[in-house]
Amino acid sequence: MSARGQDIVSIIKEQIKEFGAPVSMTSVGSVIEVGDGIARIHGLSNAKYNELLEFPGGVMGIALNLEEDSVAAVILGDDANIKEGDEVKATGRISEITVGKGMIGRVVDPLGRPLDGKGPIKAETVRPLERIAPNVVDRKSVNTPVQTGIKAIDAMIPIGRGQRELIIGDRSTGKTAIALDTIINQKGGDLVCIYVAIGQKASKVARTVALLEQYGAMEHTIVVAANSSDAVALQYLAPYAGCAIGEEFMEQGQDALVVYDDLTKHAWAYRQLSLLLRRPPGREAYPGDVFYLHSRLLERAARLNDKLGGGSLTALPIIETQAGDVSAYVPTNVISITDGQIYLEPDMFNSGIRPAVNVGISVSRVGSSAQTKAMKKVASKLKMDMGQYRELAAFAQFGTSELDKATRMQLERGQRITEVLKQGQYQPVPMANQVAILYAALNGYLDSVEVAKVRDFESGLYRFLEANFASVLNNITKENAISAETETALKTALDDYKKGLVV
């Protein structure tokens, strides 16, 4: 054999030695029953809970019931083309979503697929939708405020970074408006916002996105949408997807805010899934683990300690009540999980007091720890004063002729403070401006102003301060406190403003 032939033989032998047919093991099952978005699959004996399964045509599903000889899975899409006998593959992956800065400004579904027509999302990291919440050692006490821009909330029910604050009330009482105001108020700040729309009409989600774009809030916001027309499984996954996106920012040492709008529809979706999966129903036909459904979600909101970067994830879950019944099953569950609640009252809303925050029922268990020193100094007694005013106002309905002078003055001032706390929708007020108007209201500068002219007084005061005493507002913003010098300057400003004001 020639030298060239020997070379060819040696090359062939080397290639034979290196040859190894790639072999991959895939767990495969077959559909034995399908309907109502649920597929029962024979086989897949090694499937894991929450594992992604692949159906023909690229439709995905999630294994939720692991039985002795079958698996029940929820289908994440249209089940019209899935039929008995179809092959189902286990992917070996737990339900997950792409996360990272590339998602800011985008609208996605709970699986991270874009819904806004702006092209594919640059995937930076993939995270599981569910994970164990940070333990006690990993956490740090909440002491930094989330400025909502809403006077009634920032003054009386402060929200801290890392807190879980429930927004609860009847239909159309302004729950979503409070959440959107809070998102809009973060413009130019360092808080990344995630808005999770669960079971809403697509038109309403589109209006919300357009509103956020109008106010420049999409620059720091991610929208996760599972519409009412989507598969119920996607509605079930939506809040976990939003939480996973927020956790990525938290673990990078940043601050994030996630709004779940709303967890009532989330509980309905889970109830529907559970009944279709033939799990035993309990109270109001909810499954026995409906409390765990929300506790494992909301416990993931936290303020991490400095060793872990000091990031935070703040949760604003929304619950819709029926006829003001806060003692129903799901509302009481979520109230017991969260660190406080903002209760919106229909009667107050209908009487023109908006935001319709009922101070008596609303509470923030973090309290003044999450307030700036300036707001704490000005508004420390505001909640108690407003509570007393409401009681007096109810009593005074029977007539004020026999009330003493001090009580009548308290009623008069309470009316003016109520007017001050009113606020237009999507008009967040900067913290320094809030401090200025509340200082004026609580120190008698509004006592001589007619109730009907309080709103004009307020808007005029903001313009006057910005034009003539901008340094006062700047000092309050910069120091987050009111020094003796700043307070003196603020008093001078208020005196000058009142002198030039015709009331």
Swiss-Prot record:
**Cellular component GO terms held in the UniProt record:** plasma membrane; proton-transporting ATP synthase complex
Entry binding sites for ATP: 169-176
User: Which InterPro entries is this protein grouped with?
Assistant: ATP_synth_asu-like_sf, ATP_synth_asu_C, ATP_synth_asu_C_sf, ATP_synth_F1_a_nt-bd_dom, ATP_synth_F1_asu, ATPase_a/bsu_AS, ATPase_F1/V1/A1_a/bsu_N, ATPase_F1/V1/A1_a/bsu_N_sf
The alphabetical list of record keywords is: ATP synthesis, ATP-binding, Cell membrane, CF(1), Hydrogen ion transport, Ion transport, Membrane, Nucleotide-binding, Translocase, Transport
Gene field? atpA
EC identifiers of the protein: 7.1.2.2
Where does it localize? Cell membrane
Enzyme class, broadest EC rank: translocase
Q: Which domain of life is it from?
A: Bacteria
Keyword NAD appears in the UniProt entry: no
As for membrane topology, the entry says: Peripheral membrane protein
The record's note on quaternary structure and interaction partners says: F-type ATPases have 2 components, CF(1) - the catalytic core - and CF(0) - the membrane proton channel. CF(1) has five subunits: alpha(3), beta(3), gamma(1), delta(1), epsilon(1). CF(0) has three main subunits: a(1), b(2) and c(9-12). The alpha and beta chains form an alternating ring which encloses part of the gamma chain. CF(1) is attached to CF(0) by a central stalk formed by the gamma and epsilon chains, while a peripheral stalk is formed by the delta and b chains.
Residues at the site labelled Required for activity: 362
Its catalytic activity? ATP + H2O + 4 H(+)(in) = ADP + phosphate + 5 H(+)(out)
Would you tell me the protein name for this molecule? ATP synthase subunit alpha
Q: Write down the PROSITE patterns for this protein, in alphabetical order.
A: ATPASE_ALPHA_BETA
A Pfam family cross-referenced in the UniProt record is ATP-synt_ab_C
Give the record's family classification.
Answer: Belongs to the ATPase alpha/beta chains family.
Physiological role: Produces ATP from ADP in the presence of a proton gradient across the membrane. The alpha chain is a regulatory subunit.
Single GO molecular-function term? proton-transporting ATP synthase activity, rotational mechanism
